[in-house]
Amino acid sequence: MNHLNCFARRIVSVIALAMMVSAGWPQVIHAQPAGIDPQAEKLLRRMSEYLAGRQQFTLKAESTLEVVLTSGQKLQYDSPATLSVSRPNKLHAHRKGDITNQEFFYDGKTLTLYNPRENLYATTAAPATLDETLDFAREKLDIIAPATELLYKNAADKMLKESTSGFVVGPSVVGGVKTTQLAFRGAEVDWQIWIEDGDKPLPRKFILTSKKVSGEPEFTVLIRNWDVAAKLSDQEFNFKPAKGAKKIDFLNLSAEAAKAK
């Protein structure tokens, strides 16, 4: 028997056994309610308000992008990332992985996207606040820094805007941290979030499922090493071109990087 098929059958058997054993346990996962469960919204807003109140913080994350081939087979690409924020108007993010190597710098006046691999960068004037700049980058430049959904001061409003239902899944442990898992649905995207229990309701895991894309690929972010008491200098957010770096327009950044390969 093919080893992968054998392994898959063993997984199914283990899951079936676990379901039988847990039949007498208290139910953690409940039937999905119509609309958004008030408790799920309360937990999400508590997280959002807590993060909005952190003036400076840093984090490390592992993101996984799932790609569906025309054959239906799925591939995953991993990208470790670091992120530093100083409210109300500074951001530095670096994502380096299997298919990307990008740095984002926002110093309150300008936004810069840098590709260290090809030594290319693009710079443009930016709005005066982080929230406005995140919208500007997404809507005008079609660029998104890692985990930006969580950085808005009104993150909960942004995340719930397109959601039609949501509920509390139950307790879960993420990276050794006790969390509560929430699940939400929208017309085009389903998403889940794991929020740390206790007096620091930090997001620890985030999954987006694209339902309108063939194969329903997922994007997963596992967040670790939070420092909500970080002391960051302005130098952290200032971009200084490396020797020989080539300045180009934002619209040409991806094309130039592809041409250099």
Predicted regions and their residues:
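N-terminal secretory signal peptides that target proteins for export/translocation
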Residues: 1-8
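Bacterial N-terminal signal peptides
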Residues: 12-24
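A short, polar/proline- and glycine-enriched secondary-structure boundary/capping micro-motif
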Residues: 70, 102-106, 115, 123-125, ...
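Sec/Tat signal peptide C-region and signal peptidase I cleavage site
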Residues: 24-31
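Intrinsically disordered, low-complexity boundary segments flanking structured domains
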Residues: 43-52, 150-155, 207-210, 234-235
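Flexible, processing/modification-adjacent segments and terminal tails
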Residues: 32-43, 71, 75, 110, ...
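N-terminal mature ectodomain segment of secretory-pathway/periplasmic proteins
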Residues: 35-120
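Gly/Pro-enriched, hydrophobic low-complexity segments
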Residues: 35-38, 62, 112, 122, ...
